[in-house]
Amino acid sequence: MNAAIDCDDGNPMLRRVALEAIQAWKGRLGRIVEEGVERGEVRREVEPRRIANTIVATLEGALMVSRLEGNKVALEDARDSLEIALEGIAAR
């Protein structure tokens, strides 16, 4: 996360590495959601890209807050909230 933020300061190589890492992570998450849709485990109207972006943004933001506050409360809250959100996309 720090690398992703710092790369805006003009280090194109660092930006590329950080971008590739985030894109790979989001890609893996998106594929997991797509597979869930194909198996009938995830609702068909769910957009894998949106779920992947939401998971990554939530976890990265929670990590930043947890580091700043010096505790794991934000990470635990993010985990619990994502669990509820992911239960909400499950096929019924």
Regions picked out by a protein language model, each given a short descriptive name:
Residues 9, 40, 44, 63-70:
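Short coil/turn residues that cap or connect secondary-structure elements
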Residues 44-64, 81-85:
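Hydrophobic alpha-helical segments that form the core
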Residues 16-21, 38-54, 73, 77:
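All-alpha amphipathic helical-bundle segments outside canonical DNA-binding/catalytic cores
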Residues 23-39, 58, 68-92:
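C-terminal peripheral helix-coil segments that are non-catalytic and often amphipathic
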Residues 1-13:
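Amphipathic alpha-helical segments used for helix-helix packing
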